[in-house]
Amino acid sequence: MNNLVNLLDLDADALTAYCGELGEKPFRARQLQRWIHQFGASHFDAMTDLAKSLREKLATRAEIRSPAAISDHTSSDGTRKWLLDVGAGNAVETVYIPEDTRGTLCVSSQAGCAVNCRFCSTGKQGFSRNLSTGEIIGQLWMAEFAMRAQLGRGPKDERVISNVVMMGMGEPLLNYDAVVPAMRLMLDDNAYGLSRRRVTLSTSGVVPMMDRLSKDLPVALAVSLHASNDALRDVLVPLNRKYPLAELMAACRRYLEFAPRDFITFEYCMLDGVNDGVEHARELLKLVADVPCKFNLIPFNPFPESGLKRSNNEQIRRFAQVLMDAGIVTTIRKTRGDDIDAACGQLAGEVMDRTRLAERGKFGKITPLVPVADAGAPREARPA
């Protein structure tokens, strides 16, 4: 049995405490952290400014281990996707998205997902387990140095990865105790040194944990909205049955008191004939009237057995125009990496279905998609 401590699991405070257990002073923790997260060291003998006695001690008690890559694919548009082995037959995906002015890494927080959004292929895989802090920050550690080896650093010695979005597989706020320490490392000047504005957590709306995050580590927030009323969202995002839209909007307003940005980003997957009507856009205007926000419209990426279709471009433009005419900043996400199944909603792990009905049951049973004509029915009038 491996009893070595994985130092990727430790944020600054935990690493300082660990060094204390070894009889070392706090500055050793900062040295270790820089070697690991800024220089990509994976072996202690490379850490030449540490005392030889400490290096020998660490070699017998600790390790630096990120998930191993099963596959590594690069899209025609430069998007790069890694499939990572997290043990017991589970795999997660990490995606690097290059842009002219930044490089964004999409990080997974769970193996599978229990929320089971209707339009997301990851949810169809089911839920296996939460990732550890080391498995989460290990994705950034692995990707940063893989991309640096490929591209080098920028002309001003800037990092290849300038932004991180917790938008990969899983619901981050259902793995709070591992996600927050990982994000602390993303922000730490002795690690990755990202600003809170450059780290975005995307949630389907776990209201109590949104409130907790606002106090503990208020990074930029994106909310997977995808519907303009409770009847429709109950079906598209089953978590809505536990935390309906009124509660979610109130949580968004509370979060903005602490957020590094003065708006919430609402993500909205455009589904043909389901949630893409002009009437839905107008309903959204009423819903978010007192929530400073921007909208990111996401063309649906089809996958087998979804039973859904992508809205056509003209319908997406009409929908966006309603929002923009009301003064809401609205973007239409450019589909990236779809030729390697790295586009939004396609992160399914390329592994066998690991459906966990008990986990999904926490958010209510899955019902057939509500027809558009019925989507605005009062909650008490809808089918159970």
Curated annotation (Swiss-Prot):
Cofactor(s) recorded in Swiss-Prot or TrEMBL: [4Fe-4S] cluster
Principal location listed in the UniProt entry: cytoplasm
Functional summary from the UniProt entry: Specifically methylates position 2 of adenine 2503 in 23S rRNA and position 2 of adenine 37 in tRNAs. m2A2503 modification seems to play a crucial role in the proofreading step occurring at the peptidyl transferase center and thus would serve to optimize ribosomal fidelity.
Active site (UniProt): E93 (proton acceptor), C344 (s-methylcysteine intermediate)
Gene name tied to this protein: rlmN
Keyword Zinc part of the UniProt annotation: no
Keywords tagged on the record: 4Fe-4S, Cytoplasm, Disulfide bond, Iron, Iron-sulfur, Metal-binding, Methyltransferase, rRNA processing, S-adenosyl-L-methionine, Transferase, tRNA processing
Protein name in UniProt: Dual-specificity RNA methyltransferase RlmN
Binding site for [4Fe-4S] cluster: C113, C117, C120
Enzyme superclass (EC): transferase
InterPro entries per the UniProt record, alphabetical: Aldolase_TIM, Methyltransferase_A, RlmN_N, RNA_MTrfase_RlmN, rRNA_lsu_MTrfase_RlmN/Cfr, rSAM
Top-rank taxon: Bacteria
UniProt GO MF annotations: 4 iron, 4 sulfur cluster binding; metal ion binding; rRNA (adenine(2503)-C2-)-methyltransferase activity; rRNA binding; tRNA (adenine(37)-C2)-methyltransferase activity; tRNA binding
Family label: Belongs to the radical SAM superfamily. RlmN family.
Protein location: Cytoplasm
Matches recorded under PROSITE patterns: RADICAL_SAM
Pfam families: Radical_SAM (PF04055), RlmN_N (PF21016)
GO cellular component: cytoplasm
Catalytic activity: adenosine(2503) in 23S rRNA + 2 reduced [2Fe-2S]-[ferredoxin] + 2 S-adenosyl-L-methionine = 2-methyladenosine(2503) in 23S rRNA + 5'-deoxyadenosine + L-methionine + 2 oxidized [2Fe-2S]-[ferredoxin] + S-adenosyl-L-homocysteine; adenosine(37) in tRNA + 2 reduced [2Fe-2S]-[ferredoxin] + 2 S-adenosyl-L-methionine = 2-methyladenosine(37) in tRNA + 5'-deoxyadenosine + L-methionine + 2 oxidized [2Fe-2S]-[ferredoxin] + S-adenosyl-L-homocysteine
HAMAP family: RNA_methyltr_RlmN
